[in-house]
Design a protein with these regions (language model features):
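A conserved mid-domain beta-alpha-beta active-site/ligand-binding segment of alpha/beta enzyme cores
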Residues: 112-169
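Short, flexible loop segments at boundaries between secondary-structure elements
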Residues: 89-119
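Residues at the C-termini of beta-strands that transition into short coil/loop
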Residues: 30-32, 108-110, 126
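Extended, histidine- and acidic-residue-enriched regions that form the cofactor-binding/catalytic faces
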Residues: 182
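Conserved beta-strand scaffold positions in the cores of enzyme catalytic domains, especially
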Residues: 26-28, 104-106, 122
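Acidic/polar loop patches that form or flank catalytic/metal-binding clefts of enzymes
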Residues: 24, 95-97, 102, 144-149
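Active-site beta-strand->loop->alpha-helix modules in alpha/beta enzyme cores, enriched
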Residues: 1-97, 135-139, 153-159, 167, ...
Length: 192
């Protein structure tokens, strides 16, 4: 494992500990495509899918969250999402019973929100929960550099994320729905 990988694992563990997530519930996949150590990662392969599938079979989750914001310049988020969805498709073809009680939710990153008409689940965030989300993001110090690939937005990642969550809550308020500090929106992925 690279130094970068060790640092990012430590940051992820710190964020999980901050949010009272037991470390025995944290899984690092070590996907083969990701371990190429380069900015341009290797292509996703069946080996990546098998790693994800093995974890899904072990955990049998009721909810899975995948990146729906696929404008990642390195393609990492898209490859991870593709590996998860391919593993789910293989499990579905195999008749996995656990999938009957599982929902797959797609989230967006800090740059864009789902269109209001496409949102299928919205989780309200109190001021304290929004602050906890910010603090969790800030635990990932090695990833705090700017990301200019989606325009000239100079705000930091956590600022964009908070502003996006607050804007979603404001939109729901304008529609006459309950008023919250912020809201995190999701779209459900439904395997064919």
């Amino acid at each position: 494992m690279t130094i970068k990988g060790l640092i990012r694992r430590g940051e992820a563990r710190t964020a999980c500990t901050y949010n009272d997530i037991p470390l025995d519930h944290v899984h690092f996949l070590d996907l083969p495509f990701y371990e190429s150590g380069k900015i341009e990662k290797l292509p996703m392969t069946e080996k990546d899918v098998e790693v994800v599938r093995a974890l899904l079979q072990k955990v049998q989750p009721h909810q899975i969250y995948v990146a729906g914001d696929l404008a990642d310049p390195h393609g990492t988020h898209k490859k991870c999402t593709d590996a998860v969805l391919a593993a789910i498709d293989e499990e579905k073809k195999a008749g996995a019973e656990w999938l009957k009680d599982c929902r797959i939710w797609m989230y967006r990153g800090a740059w864009a929100e789902w269109e209001i008409e496409n949102i299928e689940m919205c989780v309200p965030l109190s001021p304290e929960e929004l602050r906890a989300k910010r603090n969790s993001i800030l635990k990932h110090q090695s990833q705090m550099e700017s990301a200019p690939f989606l325009g000239n937005d100079e705000r930091l990642f956590w600022q964009r994320a908070e502003d996006r969550n607050r804007a979603t809550a404001s939109l729901y308020d304008q529609l006459g729905l309950a008023c919250y500090e912020a809201m995190e929106a999701f779209v459900e992925y439904k395997p064919l």
